[in-house]
Regions:
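Bacterial N-terminal signal peptides that target proteins for export
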Residues: 1-10
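Bacterial N-terminal signal peptides
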Residues: 9-19
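Short, glycine-/small- and polar/acidic-enriched structural segments
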Residues: 25-159, 163-166, 172-175, 182-188, ...
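Secondary-structure end/capping motifs
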Residues: 224-306
Length: 330
């Protein structure tokens, strides 16, 4: 091979390598996202509607889920990469070997999670629910806290209250109005909408019993193969959280538009009131890790349905590095 031919081959190889790098850099990052239909999904909705993800170079394919555990199951099926779920299904998933990791705290949602009855009901507190039917989503942190903390605080045992499974929050209000159930565990925006329409009233909320963290999780596959996509997602998501905390009225307006697109005519003030009941604290703090350990121990004890075999290795299940990177300078 002559020097001339060798130089030509080297030049061609460099062109191919550079072309591959440039092509990879020009292709947008992509994730498949599960968006919660309750307020835990608001940052995602805002980031999508305001174009925050696109501005981070991220292409998002998204779908709605009524429960965090439904999104978790979609992760298991390989259908989505990012999803937020409550601590109970998160821990149960870890126990079952679901390959995912928590990278942030979506929210603390106890203030928006309520026990509601019909507006004309003669039930005024949880102690009056003995022998009654309370619509609840099974296999969730709401069920776990209701059975393990709320009922005992009123001297009631889990078996003394019927808890028919109504997974989708939007179906619990019709069941309540039709008197198929006597009460329901319900979260916003459905509580705020039901109050506004004069259909229900609140008799208790969950903050007296538990702060109810919601965990933001990603599959281990995307964590390994596309960490930059996860960071881009977190940057867009954090911008939405910032809007919620610093410009709540504007954030409420964006989410009100989303509700209108779903056929729900709700005043901005109603949505604003509901959103202010949420707490947005993204960091996985030592207190959150301790909370997860304590709840895992309770689930191992197996006092209610949904128990787990062992306390999972949370050191492997929690990743704080990507959120730190997303918060940092580019």
């Amino acid at each position: 091979m002559t020097r001339k031919h060798f130089a030509a081959l080297v030049t061609l190889a460099l062109v191919l390598v550079i072309g591959t790098i440039v092509g990879a850099q020009s292709r947008p990052l992509k994730i498949r996202l599960g968006v919660h239909t309750q307020l835990m999904g608001v940052p995602d909705v805002i980031a999508i509607r305001q174009g925050y993800f696109k501005q981070e170079g991220l292409d998002v394919d998204w779908r709605r889920f009524a429960l965090g555990k439904e999104g978790r199951d979609a992760m298991i099926a390989g259908a989505i990469d990012v999803n937020s779920t409550a601590t109970t299904p998160f821990l149960i998933g870890l126990d079952k070997g679901v390959p995912y990791t928590a990278v942030a705290v979506n929210s603390l949602f106890c203030g928006t999670n309520q026990i509601v009855v019909r507006k004309d009901s003669d039930i005024n507190n949880v102690g009056q629910l003995k022998g009654k039917k309370v619509g609840i989503p099974k296999g969730t942190v709401t069920e776990f806290i209701f059975l393990s903390k709320v009922l005992p605080s009123y001297g009631l045992k889990p078996g003394e209250v019927e808890t028919p499974n109504i997974p989708d929050a939007k179906d619990r209000i019709p069941s309540l109005v039709a008197k198929a159930i006597d009460a329901a565990a319900l979260a916003d925006p459905f509580v705020a909408i039901g109050e506004h329409e004069g259909l229900l009233r609140v008799i208790d909320n969950f903050c007296k019993y538990d702060q109810m963290p919601f965990m933001l999780t990603v599959t281990n596959k995307i964590l390994k193969e596309q960490p930059d996509a996860v960071v881009a997602y977190l940057r867009g998501w954090l911008r939405a959280v910032k809007l919620l905390t610093e410009e709540p009225e504007k954030a409420a307006g964006v989410y009100t538009d989303e509700q209108k697109s779903l056929g729900r005519e709700v005043p901005v003030a109603v949505i604003d009131k509901a959103l202010r009941r949420m707490r947005w604290e993204p960091d996985i703090s030592p207190a959150i890790e301790s909370y997860l350990k304590d709840q895992a121990k309770d689930l191992v004890a197996g006092t209610i349905e949904g128990r787990i075999k062992t306390v999972p290795d949370l050191g492997r299940a929690l990743n704080r590095d990507l959120l730190t990177k997303a918060k940092g300078a580019r």
